[in-house]
Amino acid sequence: MDPTRAPDFKPPSADEELIPPPDPESKIPKSIPIIPYVLADANSSIDAPFNIKRKKKHPKHHHHHHHSRKEGNDKKHQHIPLNQDDFQPLSAEVSSEDDDADFRSKERYGSDSTTESETRGVQKYQIADLEEVPHGIVRQARTLEDYEFPSHRLSKKLLDPNKLPLVIVACGSFSPITYLHLRMFEMALDAISEQTRFEVIGGYYSPVSDNYQKQGLAPSYHRVRMCELACERTSSWLMVDAWESLQPSYTRTAKVLDHFNHEINIKRGGVATVTGEKIGVKIMLLAGGDLIESMGEPNVWADADLHHILGNYGCLIVERTGSDVRSFLLSHDIMYEHRRNILIIKQLIYNDISSTKVRLFIRRAMSVQYLLPNSVIRYIQEHRLYVDQTEPVKQVLGNKE
């Protein structure tokens, strides 16, 4: 997020005392860069297997089993399977984690009786009440005292033995969340699956706190709930983390990523491989081209934060219509230095839905149907959000949200 909107923002200076992260950098997993195969393997065979180092105590066995899984992967496009349990009514019998894992495994690698179209099709369901929580869903608290890190959709085990784990985090105002915010994760998932050696094990929305000074910002608990409504019935891998929104002051993006690293890698020890050994999870920031361009503006982002975000974590950049992120990447010294840890995602179908324009449509009593999920539209109507707000013409015309 734009640091200049912090209420206590001061332009960064070389004499500024740096606040160390909660955990030392040595606790951030050091994985391979995110760059595509074609660049990473310029001097090696593209088809060469990528093996995760394992302890010697694990004997090599089940070769035939792993070979059959690999064949299953080749036949199907890499994707995070749709968990149909999410669409069961509250009265449905709760399944065990073993049952869920078995279902996901069968869906991932295919079976004789189930086709891909049956497992990935659009699910039909009725929403009787916005506050009716679907089966297996965890919603966020409204206070830091009651806060718990959401991990109900975070994979506990890697499915592909030749890939490394990755979690995607999107920071933003999400006022309101739109279909573009949802599509960004799907575009990132496709790019990572096709171009990298990583396996996505979860994705998070992290809405900013109310201290982020921007007109048109609904109260944080409304924005968190809208994000939950947008993804809890439509996704099997996206979650909403309210930690940033519950902070009493503006939280820098670098600190937000440190929070996810602490929760996933420090507290939970990472994720298990197919052998049962736990390894660290790479965490990456998902951002639009406008956020990256703000990183090039003088006296906005501290150099130390940029090095920390791009060097220790990495960034997935979704290009907007008309933007040229690659040229900007070439001209920015710090971003160019960490270019191997940045993956640019090109929109094959351009989508320029913006929260700013959605708020404008609502103020003008215009339809926002098909711009954001129906559950979010209903929530906005029930709570009369954005109806009586005003925004500067410059902000509306800028349309970079």
Swiss-Prot record:
Residues of the region (Disordered) are: 1-30, 48-123
pH-activity profile: Optimum pH is 7.2-8.4.
Instruction: Indicate which residues the UniProt annotation says bind NAD(+).
Output: 173-174, 253, 288, 290, 301, 320, 351
So, what pathway does this thing act in? Cofactor biosynthesis; NAD(+) biosynthesis; deamido-NAD(+) from nicotinate D-ribonucleotide: step 1/1; Cofactor biosynthesis; NAD(+) biosynthesis; NAD(+) from nicotinamide D-ribonucleotide: step 1/1
Cofactor-binding details, from the entry: Divalent metal cation.
- Domain of life assignment: Eukaryota
Q: Where does ATP bind?
A: 181, 356-359
Q: Which CDD domains match?
A: NMNAT_Eukarya (cd09286)
Keywords attached to this entry = ATP-binding, Cytoplasm, NAD, Nucleotide-binding, Nucleotidyltransferase, Nucleus, Phosphoprotein, Pyridine nucleotide biosynthesis, Transferase
Q: Which Pfam families match?
A: CTP_transf_like
Family annotation (PANTHER family): NICOTINAMIDE MONONUCLEOTIDE ADENYLYLTRANSFERASE (PTHR12039), NICOTINAMIDE-NUCLEOTIDE ADENYLYLTRANSFERASE (PTHR12039:SF0)
Question: Further remark, if any?
Answer: Present with 5130 molecules/cell in log phase SD medium.
What is the protein's quaternary organization?
Homotetramer.
Its recorded name reads: Nicotinamide/nicotinic acid mononucleotide adenylyltransferase 1
Gene name of this polypeptide: NMA1
